[in-house]
Amino acid sequence: MIIKICGLMRTQDAEILNTACPDFAGMILSPGFRRSVSAETAQAIRSTLRPEIPAVGVFVNSPYQFIAEFADTGIIQYIQLHGSEDAFYLRGLKLSFKLPVIQAFRIRSADDLGRAAKSEADMILLDSGAGTGKAFDHSLLGGFPRPYLLAGGLSPENIRGILAEHRPYGVDVSSGVETDGEKDPDKIRAFVSAVRGA
């Protein structure tokens, strides 16, 4: 099972991940969000991260030219879409960049899961909403037809129980491994350990 730690904001966060060894490191690259980082900070984080930990750039309804600043310079190895991007946008994105694409879906009903199942993205992420720290109704996941990353409301304390009931392809956490708005090394290590042991 893959583990993504999202919302890195400092090179210190990358140093924590270098010892905790998750599978992916995520950065919010669209401006205007609490965890958004500049291109310069993103480059510094990428340079600090161990080469074998891919960096995921999270974008919200961004023009292709903006994504190119990160995709064409090696700052990111994966593109994650967290807005209202449609199938046409996704096809154009995949033609423009040769990076794998993760598409996030806010799950409030079975209809949202139906849309997610049809996505042409390389991976899909099922979430309660960007960075809310709250879970959606996991009972909706029964019989979901494709592999998915699970996000929203995950923490070191609850992840084992969640994974005892559901077997996602991977898990994605941000606020659940923070203390006072910053990444907490102990929580990150505890989360990774709990997932690896589940």
Where are these regions (language model features)?
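Conserved N-terminal beta1-alpha1 strand-loop-helix module at the mouth
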Residues: 1-126, 130-198
